[in-house]
């Protein structure tokens, strides 16, 4: 685990701590109509199962806002109301949810912001100042355009508004749709405020595009110690947002959990259907939370070397293969018997590690 994380003010969204020494949380956003409580609840359940810590829902009209009371009652995750344009929906939402997200570029005048702050104070819930490069306030857009500087100036202006209202339970996000502006904006703002940061690349695209952009932008920031909560925005299945987010946390040294799959890129030496085997291993072992390095290699050329550094490895030969545990060969089996035996051995190793931690 990296030790260079920037320590920020800690806030709470429901029972989830954001900032300070708290783990970096992951979140997603439902795509159902929020007033459709059954559909929205089903999506929240899916996110909970995928490992999300928080969930955000769109509040597009009064019907959505009024549905939040019941949705909060049935939600297994802390609930964040996402408000654009209509501050009165935030006033209704504040009576039920765990946090409010506002976009300073479209929420309205200082008086409207004050009304939202007063409602959040009354219920003791935090606010996210959600700055987007594509919807900056007119004065910042005209002066700076959709640049990191414009985003930072907007964030500072709105942070000062909240501070002047004696409200400091907030976090900040600075989202652009590309890697460079996103990184530059967060880097620029970090030394200027103590508040926690919500990381994200907005409108990042489909699974492939978003995974690349998010890994570069969010992973880069996380390795610099920047970031307290995050969302990977993907045009696609909800669960993928959490899966990719947690992978970024693991590989940036911010989360020690689960399987780290090591597999070779294939070449003419492979002795099995390695692509299929690596996919099967990853899927079957996805439930394991114990941090383990697992190697799946198509031949013995690199397998033995990799196995020295892996917790468990499988190496294919000619219609057979080796299972290697902590650098030692424990099985030589026919290819048809390798997969199930390997899965059992990995699961047993995970149990051993968990038991040793408890002891």
Swiss-Prot record:
It catalyses: (2E)-4-hydroxy-3-methylbut-2-enyl diphosphate + oxidized [flavodoxin] + H2O + 2 H(+) = 2-C-methyl-D-erythritol 2,4-cyclic diphosphate + reduced [flavodoxin]. GO terms for biological process: isopentenyl diphosphate biosynthetic process, methylerythritol 4-phosphate pathway; terpenoid biosynthetic process. [4Fe-4S] cluster binds at residues 264, 267, 299, 306. It comes from the Bacteria. The keyword 4Fe-4S applies. The gene is ispG. Pfam families: GcpE. It comes from Helicobacter pylori (strain Shi470). Keywords: 4Fe-4S, Iron, Iron-sulfur, Isoprene biosynthesis, Metal-binding, Oxidoreductase. The keyword 4Fe-4S applies. This is 4-hydroxy-3-methylbut-2-en-1-yl diphosphate synthase (flavodoxin). It is an enzyme of class 1 (oxidoreductase). Its EC number is 1.17.7.3. Belongs to the IspG family.
């Amino acid at each position: 685990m990296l030790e260079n994380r920037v320590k920020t003010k800690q806030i709470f969204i429901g029972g989830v701590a954001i900032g300070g020494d708290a783990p970096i949380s992951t979140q997603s956003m439902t795509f159902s109509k929020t007033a459709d409580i059954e559909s929205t609840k089903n999506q929240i359940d899916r996110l909970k199962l995928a490992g999300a810590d928080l969930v955000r829902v769109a509040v597009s009209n009064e019907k959505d806002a009024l549905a939040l009371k019941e949705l909060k009652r049935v939600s297994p995750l802390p609930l964040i109301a996402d408000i654009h344009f209509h501050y009165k929906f935030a006033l209704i939402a504040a009576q039920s949810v765990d946090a409010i997200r506002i976009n300073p570029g479209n929420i309205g005048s200082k008086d409207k912001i004050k009304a939202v702050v007063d409602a959040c104070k009354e219920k003791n819930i935090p606010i996210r100042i959600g700055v987007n490069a594509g919807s900056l306030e007119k004065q910042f857009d005209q002066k700076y355009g959709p640049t990191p500087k414009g985003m930072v100036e907007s964030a500072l202006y709105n942070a000062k508004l909240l501070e002047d209202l004696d409200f400091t339970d907030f976090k900040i996000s600075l989202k652009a749709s590309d890697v460079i502006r996103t990184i530059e904006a967060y880097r620029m703002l970090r030394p200027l405020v103590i508040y926690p940061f919500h990381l994200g690349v907005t409108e990042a695209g489909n699974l492939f595009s978003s995974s690349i952009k998010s890994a570069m932008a969010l992973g880069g920031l996380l390795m610099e110690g920047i970031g307290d909560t995050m969302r990977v925005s993907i045009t696609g299945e909800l669960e993928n947002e959490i899966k990719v987010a947690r992978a970024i946390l693991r590989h940036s040294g911010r989360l020690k959990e689960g399987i780290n799959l090591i597999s070779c890129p294939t070449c003419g030496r492979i002795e099995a259907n390695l692509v299929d085997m690596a996919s099967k291993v990853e899927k079957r072992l996805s439930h394991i939370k114990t941090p383990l390095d697992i190697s799946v290699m198509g031949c013995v050329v690199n397998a033995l070397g990799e196995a020295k550094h892996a917790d468990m490895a499988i190496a294919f030969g000619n219609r057979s293969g080796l299972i290697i545990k902590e650098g030692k060969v424990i099985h030589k089996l026919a290819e048809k018997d390798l997969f199930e035996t390997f899965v059992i051995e990995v699961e047993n190793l995970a149990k051993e590690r968990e038991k040793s931690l408890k002891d």
